């Protein structure tokens, strides 16, 4: 049940943190978009070793819950940096959340972009080449 009194009481407390949420969304979306484009390009071009690494990464990201990925990045990366002799205490903890969400978005976007590009019929691509368009222009 929705209690309007509780809603009115908690809404000002929640809305104060809205800029932080928006910042996490925008940064993770931007980094995920870049990573997704890179992963899709690697998989489409079938670069020998990188294509297999990208396929494993995408499979891992798509098959594990985001909360598990957040735990691995949030607790694992500082521990790994500590093992390497790098002090991670100066790094703000929200950076690890940016990384976790960015990797998650990148994995999903990479597969989405790859499937979208491969869904274009070959005749359409050949028509673009016949019209004198470059490779990247036929993609756009």
Q: Where are each of the predicted segments found?
A:
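Transmembrane alpha-helices and adjacent helix-loop boundaries
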Residues: 1-140
């Amino acid at each position: 049940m929705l209690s309007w009194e509780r809603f009115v009481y908690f809404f000002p407390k929640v809305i104060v943190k809205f800029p932080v949420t928006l910042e996490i969304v925008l940064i993770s979306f931007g980094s995920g978009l870049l990573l997704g484009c890179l992963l899709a390009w690697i998989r489409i071009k079938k670069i020998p070793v990188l294509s297999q690494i990208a396929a494993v990464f995408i499979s891992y990201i798509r098959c594990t819950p985001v909360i598990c990925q957040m735990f691995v990045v949030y607790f694992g990366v500082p521990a790994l940096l500590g093992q390497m002799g790098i002090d991670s205490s100066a790094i703000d903890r929200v950076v690890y959340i940016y990384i976790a969400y960015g990797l998650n978005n990148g994995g999903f976007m990479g597969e989405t972009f790859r499937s979208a590009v491969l869904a274009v019929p070959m005749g359409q691509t050949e028509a673009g080449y016949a019209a004198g368009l470059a490779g990247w222009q036929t993609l756009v």
